[in-house]
């Protein structure tokens, strides 16, 4: 059966750290292989050069500055997976999140950026999925023992209207109402 490339969704993956380009490449390939119709990787030149060899099915765009037009037609955004922590990434993520209305998945360095800008959590207008490990989650809430983590995760997800996928030996997923 033949279908147009965009029939099964249009994903924007925001990344850009040369040192963690493997994370960007694996995430792009996973999105393509999971059935996303069009995967666009918004990154730096070195990541994009590697992408053309590792995952030629994905499209790409160089990330010099935020351009709202690049979000047109996108149905979901993945931020992280090789983003890198620097002033440009922080400015870029804040600008992007203030303009998007589509679901966003957060993984990696962007969680650190999000923890520094709680106002973004309080004012989002779409479905957000945060995927921190225990150390990243501690940047948002303070818990002393693992037993406190379940209650903290539920309260956090409910307060900010997000789905939390707390990764670890015993992964916890909560939307604030139900926990798995």
Name these PLM-found stretches.
Residues 3-103, 112-129, 134, 138-180:
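Small-residue (G/A/S/T)-rich helix-start motifs and N-terminal tracts that mark the onset
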């Amino acid at each position: 059966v033949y279908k147009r490339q965009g029939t099964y969704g249009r994903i924007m993956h925001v990344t850009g750290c040369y040192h963690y380009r493997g994370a960007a490449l694996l995430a792009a390939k996973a999105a393509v292989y999971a059935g996303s119709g069009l995967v666009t990787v918004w990154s730096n030149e070195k990541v994009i050069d590697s992408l053309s060899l590792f995952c030629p099915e994905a499209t790409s765009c160089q990330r010099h500055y935020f351009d709202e037009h690049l979000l047109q037609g996108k149905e979901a955004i993945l931020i992280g997976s090789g983003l890198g922590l620097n002033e440009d990434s922080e400015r870029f993520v804040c600008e992007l999140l203030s303009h998007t209305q589509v679901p966003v998945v957060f993984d990696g360095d962007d969680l650190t950026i999000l923890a520094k800008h709680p106002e973004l959590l309080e004012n989002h207008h779409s479905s957000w999925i945060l995927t921190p490990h225990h150390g990243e989650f501690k940047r948002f809430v303070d818990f002393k023992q693992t037993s406190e983590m379940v209650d903290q995760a539920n309260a956090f997800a409910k307060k900010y209207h997000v789905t939390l996928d707390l990764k670890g030996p015993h992964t916890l997923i909560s939307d604030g109402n139900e926990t798995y």
